[in-house]
């Protein structure tokens, strides 16, 4: 598996160049804007291509070194695609709501994950000793915790890099990563604030096709990094590729 190529045509077809109405913009994004068309800011894709490639290389390098990638996108347009991409490459995600302290108070989050596991074990054992009402309440509580923490349940520690869709909505995630010195890769629309983003990717962060493209490219970069790590350790790359293929099939069925 090779690093994914990024072409200008790919980005154009996905609508990556369309920013927001000129009334809704952040002046800090001015260096990344090409101009205005029909009162809509147009993002300079000549800059996006190399910046996207740089971000993908960094993600690839992180996973080649055995690092963890956390995908973050909680708005409706991104949530499903973020989860699907993270699962496809064996990484982690937050797609429901960013809980305060998710990174900076990891110990408390770990306790909540432990609580989630205990609930799952109880329910897997048919909830012996519980009344029907207690079972229903436990299931509701489990579902609520799983929506918030299910995507990081297996992470086992802090991530080594974040990939974020919409930094305006995920401002808290950026701030927490900055406090801990965790690098941030993020898509920045014309109304975004680039502050605190280590590897910015100027582009539309609302269009489904654009979001899907970013997520696919990042997932492929992760898989390329994992392949490189396995090759360096002398592991069987064929075995590595077989496992994700099965996982992809399962996810694709659920995604359909």
Swiss-Prot record:
Keywords: Ribonucleoprotein, Ribosomal protein
Pfam families: Ribosomal_S2 (PF00318)
InterPro entries named among the record's database cross-references: Ribosomal_uS2, Ribosomal_uS2_bac/mit/plastid, Ribosomal_uS2_CS, Ribosomal_uS2_flav_dom_sf
GO molecular function: structural constituent of ribosome
Example of a GO biological process term: translation
Gene Ontology CC annotation, any one: cytosolic small ribosomal subunit
Family assignment from sequence similarity: Belongs to the universal ribosomal protein uS2 family.
NCBIfam families: rpsB_bact
Full protein name: Small ribosomal subunit protein uS2
Gene: rpsB
């Amino acid at each position: 598996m090779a690093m994914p190529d990024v072409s200008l045509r790919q980005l154009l077809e996905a609508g990556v160049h369309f920013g927001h109405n000129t009334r809704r913009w952040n002046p800090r994004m001015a260096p990344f804007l090409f101009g205005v068309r029909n009162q809509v800011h147009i993002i300079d894709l000549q800059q996006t291509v190399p910046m996207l490639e740089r971000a993908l290389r960094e993600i690839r390098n992180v996973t080649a070194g055995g690092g963890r990638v956390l995908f973050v996108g909680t708005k409706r347009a991104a949530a499903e695609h973020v989860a699907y991409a993270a699962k496809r490459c064996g990484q982690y995600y937050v797609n429901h709501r960013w809980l305060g302290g998710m990174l900076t108070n990891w110990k408390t989050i770990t306790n909540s994950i432990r609580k989630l596991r205990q609930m799952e074990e109880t329910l897997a054992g048919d909830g012996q000793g519980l009344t029907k009402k207690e079972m229903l309440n436990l299931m509701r509580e489990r579902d609520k915790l799983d929506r918030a923490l299910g995507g990081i349940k297996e992470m086992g520690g802090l991530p080594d890099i974040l990939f974020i869709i919409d930094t305006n909505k995920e401002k808290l995630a950026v701030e927490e990563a900055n406090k801990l010195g965790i690098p941030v890769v993020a898509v920045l629309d014309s109304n975004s604030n680039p502050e605190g983003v280590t590897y910015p990717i100027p582009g539309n962060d609302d269009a489904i096709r654009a979001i899907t493209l970013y997520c696919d490219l990042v997932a492929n970069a992760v898989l390329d990094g994992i392949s490189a790590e396995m090759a360096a350790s002398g592991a069987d790359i064929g075995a590595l590729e077989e496992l994700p293929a099965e996982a992809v099939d399962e996810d694709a069925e659920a995604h359909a």
